[in-house]
């Protein structure tokens, strides 16, 4: 199958979600507080971390509703406010902006997969 096995103790979020989701959540806080625009946050993270997608591109791919659900599980399971979902993430999900699967999340997606437009901040 070409898979690599990793092991983790039984903790909320295990390994990947426990590290990845707070990064995505922090990107939402950076946008929410006006640190930078979404395009610059994504570009900075791609260039600065050598990731193939920025945090907003990845969140839209995963689904903003899924990201929010995981943040809520982490917050409840670990009891640490650093896992509290950003209000902007909650606002996007409440507005039905769920990401690629809905055609709009942080970015707007046309039916042509080569075309991605920036959408204004809620």
Can you say where each PLM-predicted feature lies in the sequence?
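NAD(P)-dependent Rossmann-like dehydrogenase/reductase catalytic/cofactor-binding core
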Residues: 2-14, 29-33, 37-122
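Structural/interface elements that position substrates and couple domains in central-metabolism enzymes
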Residues: 20-26
């Amino acid at each position: 199958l070409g898979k690599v096995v990793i092991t983790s103790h039984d903790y909320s979020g295990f390994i990947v979600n426990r590290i990845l989701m707070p990064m995505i959540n922090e990107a939402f806080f950076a946008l929410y507080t006006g640190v930078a625009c979404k395009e610059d946050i994504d570009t900075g993270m791609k260039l600065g971390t050598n990731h193939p997608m920025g945090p907003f591109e990845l969140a839209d791919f995963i689904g903003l509703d899924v990201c929010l659900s995981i943040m809520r599980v982490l917050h409840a399971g670990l009891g640490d406010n650093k896992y509290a979902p950003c209000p902007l993430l909650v606002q996007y999900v409440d507005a039905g902006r769920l990401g690629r699967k809905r055609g709009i999340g942080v970015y707007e997606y046309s039916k042509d997969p080569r075309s991605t437009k920036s959408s204004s901040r809620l």
